[in-house]
Amino acid sequence: MTHVKLAIIGSGPAGYTAAIYASRALLTPILFEGFFSGIAGGQLMTTTEVENFPGFPQGVLGHQLMENMKMQAQRFGTQVIAKDITSVDFSVRPFVLKSGEDTFTCDACIIATGASAKRLSIPGAGDNEFWQKGVTACAVCDGASPIFRDRDLFVIGGGDSALEEAMFLTRYGKRVFVVHRRDTLRASKAMVNKAQANEKIVFLWNSEVVKILGDSLVRSIDIFNNVEKTTVTMEAAGVFFAIGHQPNTAFLGGQLSLDENGYIITEKGSSRTSVPGVFAAGDVQDKYYRQAITSAGSGCMAALDAERFLEK
């Protein structure tokens, strides 16, 4: 059994920033990278170019930004472990963290497990159907696959992430259709203008994918127009979900107060949770901003809050 002053569960901008601050404060933290968002390092590992993170006037690749943060945390003494924490016990002191058969204890804990992409429960999209056979939730991860080259691809969603994925897919697909159930988008004006200016992107308004068909791979989809009440079948090689995220809090076992959507509730103006000594940072507690820079900022807050807690 390993004991540390501070354990950080999750990576990404929040976890790595918390680790940088905590290790510089000589708290010798241990950070569990985890794969809560499908990949260690969080959602930015599947983002191409990040143009709005301060200090990079020419932009920076998402995975490179995360690798830089990780190396910076390790430089100051953070121990990074490529494991998931599968359960916790915050009812005892020190806190108990489980990772498979391994047990760790800590005096304070920062939760930075982020949020994972949501998937629609429609015929053909299941794990035993066409999931990862043309259906995915990560264009950056899978878009370069030969099965998508010069084919018609479909992105489901109406936010910034949906349009970013659509624009990325124009590198590979013949046409990229953005399927949205309404006639207006939630995305920012800048992102909408950029997508509408791309001649390879086609918008399907008031539309919903109701069925995915194929053989060993996706071949076509049925699209329902909820205004005209009609259904059409269109050839398709890929379907990409971009419909939001689910906070990764199931492993907590209900030991922290969560809101109606499963996000960790923190005290206003701090990272403190309902359990003293447990702090939360990043998208796991932020359903409003969900930006790399705000996640990093909240990681800093969590480290400072944890440091003050441990000094008591």
Swiss-Prot record:
Assigned GO CC terms: cytoplasm
Protein keywords: Cytoplasm, Disulfide bond, FAD, Flavoprotein, NADP, Oxidoreductase, Redox-active center
Cofactor: FAD
One annotated GO biological process: removal of superoxide radicals
Cellular location(s): Cytoplasm
EC number(s) reported in the record: 1.8.1.9
Class of this enzyme: oxidoreductase
Catalytic activity annotation: [thioredoxin]-dithiol + NADP(+) = [thioredoxin]-disulfide + NADPH + H(+)
Keyword Membrane: no
Molecular functions (GO terms): thioredoxin-disulfide reductase (NADPH) activity
Database matches in Gene3D superfamilies: FAD/NAD(P)-binding domain (3.50.50.60)
Pfam families: Pyr_redox_2
Disulfide feature: 138-141
UniProt cross-references to PANTHER family, sorted A to Z: THIOREDOXIN REDUCTASE 1-RELATED-RELATED (PTHR48105)
Subunit details: Homodimer.
Protein name per its UniProtKB record: Thioredoxin reductase
